[in-house]
C-alpha cells in the first residue's frame, strides 16, 4: 500500500503546521510515499517544498503538484520546463472543481462536455511532451459505471502513451469491469440559456444544502458529487444574474 498526503497550499496558514506534523510524526519507514501540494502556480512552490522535505527523516517523499487555479494552468508549461533537469516530480494532478471556481466557470463542466475535455487534452499534451504522468480529477458521478469507463476509454484513445492515475474518490469504480463492447464517450458542447443556468445554480445550491455530509463537506445527490466549490460558484452566479 502506498499512501499520499494532501497538505494545505503553501499560501495557507496551516501549511507550516502540516509540514511540521509530517516531519515529526511520520517515520522514515512509513507507508506514506508522497505529498500532494495544492494550488501550485509556480515552480518555486515545488522547490520550496522539496527543500523542506530534504530536512525530513523521510527525505524521499515524492511531490505531486496540483493544478487547481487559472494561474496554475496558465503557468503549467513554465512549471514543467523548469523541472526538466531537476526532476522534482513525476506526477501532476488536475483539480477540476477548484479550477472551475478559480476561473469563474459556470456551470462546472462534466465528462459529458467538450469543455471538460478541452482542459484535460491541454494538460495531457503538456505532460506527454515532458514525460510526466497524470493524476485525474475526481469523477463526479460515483455511481455511473458506464460513464466512468466511457470516459476512461476516451482518455486512452486521446493519449495512449500517457500514464494516468485515478482519484481515490473513484476507487470502487476503477475496480469494476467495463461492459462488453462499451466505447468511448462522445462529449457535446454545453449550451444553456441564462434561464437554464440560473435554474441549474438554484438546483445545485438546494441539493448541496440538503444532502451534504456535514457543514464543511461535500454532498451526493441523484448520483452526482457536489463539492463546496460548486455550491460557492453557484451562489456567485446567482448573485450576478438573478
Predicted region positions:
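Expand to "…catalyze enediolate/carbanion chemistry for C-C bond making/breaking, isomerization
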Residues: 1-242
Amino acid at each position: 500500500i502506498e499512501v499520499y498526503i494532501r497538505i494545505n497550499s503553501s499560501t495557507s496558514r496551516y501549511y507550516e503546521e502540516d509540514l511540521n506534523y509530517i516531519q515529526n510524526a511520520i517515520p522514515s519507514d512509513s507507508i506514506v510515499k508522497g505529498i500532494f501540494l495544492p494550488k501550485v502556480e509556480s515552480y518555486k512552490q515545488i522547490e520550496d517544498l522539496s527543500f523542506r522535505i530534504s530536512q525530513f527523516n523521510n527525505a524521499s517523499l515524492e511531490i505531486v503538484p496540483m493544478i487547481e487555479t487559472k494561474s496554475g494552468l496558465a503557468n503549467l508549461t513554465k512549471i514543467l520546463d523548469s523541472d526538466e533537469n531537476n526532476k522534482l516530480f513525476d506526477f501532476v494532478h488536475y483539480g477540476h472543481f477548484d479550477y472551475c471556481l478559480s476561473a469563474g466557470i459556470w456551470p462546472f463542466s462534466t465528462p459529458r462536455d467538450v469543455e471538460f475535455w478541452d482542459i484535460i487534452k491541454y494538460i495531457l499534451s503538456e505532460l506527454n511532451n515532458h514525460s510526466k504522468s497524470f493524476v485525474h480529477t475526481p469523477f463526479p458521478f460515483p455511481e455511473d459505471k458506464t460513464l466512468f469507463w466511457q470516459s476512461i476509454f476516451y482518455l486512452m484513445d486521446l493519449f495512449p502513451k500517457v500514464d494516468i492515475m485515478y482519484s481515490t474518490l473513484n476507487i470502487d469504480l476503477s475496480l469494476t469491469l467495463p461492459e462488453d463492447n462499451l466505447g468511448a464517450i462522445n462529449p457535446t458542447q454545453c449550451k444553456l440559456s441564462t434561464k437554464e443556468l440560473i435554474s441549474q445554480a438554484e438546483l445545485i445550491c438546494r441539493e448541496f444544502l440538503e444532502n451534504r455530509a456535514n457543514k464543511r463537506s461535500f454532498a451526493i445527490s441523484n448520483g452526482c458529487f457536489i463539492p463546496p466549490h460548486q455550491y460557492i460558484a453557484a451562489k456567485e452566479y446567482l448573485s450576478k444574474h438573478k
